[in-house]
A protein has these predicted regions:
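Class I SAM-binding transferase module
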Residues: 2-256
Length: 256
């Protein structure tokens, strides 16, 4: 899809890279059906395996990608784009997006308890809730998910240079609006270029195939308006963990 958009916008030569052979084969047929077979070539494989001359016929003037996940990192975006920027992009070329950020805010998610274990057949199974997956995925359009602080960038990344050293930490100070909160919600921002950006910030009118991630507190916090709460995040290049500073997790990195 991105390749056909590039060709429609005027690109004279486009190389699309798709690792899954079945999807790549279907993509070739779709490209031909839309009349772009003369300008778009679909290469099967990972972009890190592309040969500069045989696959690309030289450095690319523009590299457009969409390989980010709900936490921005899970698809190996940092190492993949660092390789593309350093090896495949022409001097002065443009990476789209050129960067991204992990965004966070204090939040309430009313529907979070709907999947909690409670009483079954007269037995109290509440203890199983300690095994619930964290973070929990939530649709950004979920009407029961409400933000109660000014959003902040917890981790920011430059996709035009070398990948950040791992593990990488970041911190942000969130200011409460005075509403009791039950956790931290995380979403993503993509900086397409120096002027335009995309953000799947949660809200009732939000539309995105990317979801948000919710990190619940052990118990709701009743904070006065203006109260500052410091949030910490750490990643290993693929996984992300977020917590409030006074509640350090058992491990600073998620287990694989």
């Amino acid at each position: 899809l991105l390749s056909m958009m590039a060709a429609r916008a005027g690109a004279g030569r486009v190389v699309a890279c798709e690792e899954n052979p079945a999807i790549a084969d279907s993509a070739r047929r779709i490209v031909a059906a839309n009349g772009y077979a003369d300008r778009i070539r679909v290469v099967t494989g990972n972009s890190t395996e592309l040969e500069l001359e045989s696959d690309l016929e030289g450095h690319a003037d523009v590299i457009v990608s969409e390989i980010v996940s709900n936490n921005l990192l899970a698809e190996g975006v940092l190492t993949t784009l660092a390789d593309a920027a350093s090896r495949l992009l022409a001097p002065g070329g443009q990476m789209i997006p050129m960067g991204g950020a992990v965004m966070v805010a204090l939040a309430n998610w009313g529907a979070a308890t709907r999947t909690h274990m409670a009483e079954v057949a007269g037995f109290d199974l509440d203890g199983f809730n300690a095994l619930a997956q964290v973070p929990r995925n939530v649709a950004v359009s979920d009407a029961t998910l409400t933000l109660h602080s000014t959003p902040a960038a917890l981790l920011s990344f430059d996709f035009t240079g070398k990948a950040a050293r791992e593990p990488h930490r970041g911190a942000a100070t969130l200011v409460s609006d005075g509403t009791p909160v039950s956790g931290i919600v995380q979403w993503i921002r993509l900086d397409l270029d120096a002027e335009a950006s995309y953000e799947n910030r949660p809200g009732p009118d939000a539309k995105s195939h990317w979801g948000a991630q919710f990190y619940p507190f052990d118990a709701p916090l009743d904070l006065a308006a203006g109260t500052e709460l410091r949030v910490v995040g750490v990643h290993d290049g693929h996984q992300l963990l977020v917590w409030r500073e006074d509640r350090c997790p058992r491990s600073e990195l998620p287990s694989s």
